[in-house]
Amino acid sequence: MLETNKNHATAWQGFKNGRWNRHVDVREFIQLNYTLYEGNDSFLAGPTEATSKLWEQVMQLSKEERERGGMWDMDTKVASTITSHDAGYLDKDLETIVGVQTEKPFKRSMQPFGGIRMAKAACEAYGYELDEETEKIFTDYRKTHNQGVFDAYSREMLNCRKAGVITGLPDAYGRGRIIGDYRRVALYGVDFLMEEKMHDFNTMSTEMSEDVIRLREELSEQYRALKELKELGQKYGFDLSRPAENFKEAVQWLYLAYLAAIKEQNGAAMSLGRTSTFLDIYAERDLKAGVITESEVQEIIDHFIMKLRIVKFARTPDYNELFSGDPTWVTESIGGVGIDGRPLVTKNSFRFLHSLDNLGPAPEPNLTVLWSVRLPDNFKTYCAKMSIKTSSIQYENDDIMRESYGDDYGIACCVSAMTIGKQMQFFGARANLAKTLLYAINGGKDEKSGAQVGPNFEGINSEVLEYDEVFKKFDQMMDWLAGVYINSLNVIHYMHDKYSYERIEMALHDTEIVRTMATGIAGLSVAADSLSAIKYAQVKPIRNEEGLVVDFEIEGDFPKYGNNDDRVDDIAVDLVERFMTKLRSHKTYRDSEHTMSVLTITSNVVYGKKTGNTPDGRKAGEPFAPGANPMHGRDQKGALSSLSSVAKIPYDCCKDGISNTFSIVPKSLGKEPEDQNRNLTSMLDGYAMQCGHHLNINVFNRETLIDAMEHPEEYPQLTIRVSGYAVNFIKLTREQQLDVISRTFHESM
């Protein structure tokens, strides 16, 4: 138990007390103090003059950034740390929430700890030159994560990486997907948190095993990072040592804690957590005391959201191929239901979504509604209304996640749930199941290069592919792949902890935490449809002069995933369960728990490039379907049948998430807005009751996207949902835009 002081008494005045006063327990604080809101959106306030002026400035900077080839400015000398840069502002006189990553908004930081080669490549991609002294330091004197990984990789791992049977690995970029509990800084102040870490350090085991030594060093780094966080606050004129005393301070304290994380790390997903209900407690207290108005509350939220929209990292061209459109995954989880049955919806839940009106649509922050059939009807209707209007919201099934994670979890990146401040993950990208099937047919040889990448066993020699024979070899190939995959991830995360440790994010966790090893699969629908074709049609392999199977001839029809047909849907379910079982047989770094996702981001295009012709009729180089989606155009029985197929994928085997991106034309939801809202709400309820996990919802016509592709200057804020995140459509590459346009747009329910 830690001692509190008069600062805490002042900051906590009017709050209901509990264990949270003596120990870090943000969840209990929320449960004791939040105010459920079941009303409608009529209380919401429009943008203030300051908000409109600031957003005009952001839009002008965004325009200049596009005109400069995607990079407004970049630091090429100073390695980014929590305290590396002076304070920066958009307009100090107008901003209610302040802080940017460098001394100027839109100037991107240089983050070499993950890999100096990547930092250099990011500079050169935009016409900048990395400072010679900085390059020398991180080449000759300070080893990086990337160098450590490649020092330890085996030849087999390198071959799999090059061929693309495992790809997107976080060995050349920050792993991300760790959510610091940034709320702790607002509630307790940094001094309280430092005392807690020192207490843990002084009371832990002194039996110096390797695990104990590592944890003691990590705690020392966490303590140091918290001290630097106070210095960051001082740069902006704030005393973060004490807890926040009002709503504005609570938002500012929380944001500066998040800012420290994104100054120190450039992880693929730097998610925010679950902040709206927590912050609403402060807003309600100030509103009741008459010290703030609703318009002022909304202005502070809008300025906070504005800061989250301009989070930026310098990325390499290879990274941008995998994760297109400059995403940062500042994921904020909104809503959900408590384990006591009370919805966690507050007025702030509305205010966060209302920023899409006040500032216009945007991909960041990645607004994620934790959907439950028990959410208040007015909130459900408002969510549907904003989805139809902006296509900027994703939905995740709180009713199935709450069973595993309780009621204070957040979403990291796209679809990965974790209990805030008590759990982190080792992000693991994806294994390519479609390509693995081709390896089974070709005896471990790569269908594109002819190289022996997989184990060297006899391939399929028959003139017609026979299901049992193919599946037996496929099963053996998945055994091999699971081992190489887990071992690769063990190397990556050992080195990331060693050379690019997330000090401030982990300082905002409990000392003892749950770790997961978050694997993933790509090409699920391609593999399932391919096996269905082999089983129900006649598939003849076509070989080249070396005897390598390079194409297929299909005679007859076959069931296709996405039409609520158990004959093929059961194949998809079996593949997920089977591969997860194989992964679990391998030991993980730090005894992390195995999890898996069915998620591709926009890398479905890259996976397609890496994969040859497949037995389902997909041609070499064609993109895979994103995430757990059916292949483009194959879900022909309407929206509900498509959703039903995806909902069969078992969440118990895919606790890292099952991504489904769903596009529907407005008229199919109804003629009148009220009908559209009601039908979309009913569809979400039905999907949740079927145990579907995740749904990106796009509501627009294909013609809109085609026009935006031809006239991007007219669509600066056109936002679409892709696999697990949102993106400005005009920031996608032409190839990725065409991929999105080619996907199924449901014209009937």
Swiss-Prot record:
Among the GO molecular function terms of this UniProt record, one is: formate C-acetyltransferase activity
Q: Which residues are annotated as modified residue Glycine radical in the UniProt record?
A: 724
- Annotated pathway, please? Fermentation; pyruvate fermentation; formate from pyruvate: step 1/1
The answer, when asked if Transmembrane helix is one of the entry's keywords, is: no
A Pfam cross-reference name: PFL-like
Which catalytic residues are annotated? 413-414
Per UniProt, the keywords (alphabetical) are: Acyltransferase, Carbohydrate metabolism, Cytoplasm, Glucose metabolism, Organic radical, Transferase
Control of this protein's activity: Activated by pfl-activating enzyme under anaerobic conditions via generation of an organic free radical. Exposure of activated pfl to oxygen results in a cleavage at the glycine residue harboring its organic radical with loss of the 25 C-terminal amino acids.
**Top-level division of the source organism's lineage:** Bacteria
- Which parts of the sequence belong to the Glycine radical domain? 626-749
Q: How does it assemble?
A: Homodimer.
What family does this chain come from, according to its entry?
Answer: Belongs to the glycyl radical enzyme (GRE) family. PFL subfamily.
Name the chain's protein: Formate acetyltransferase
Record the organism. Answer: Staphylococcus aureus (strain COL)
Name of the gene encoding the protein in the UniProt record: pflB
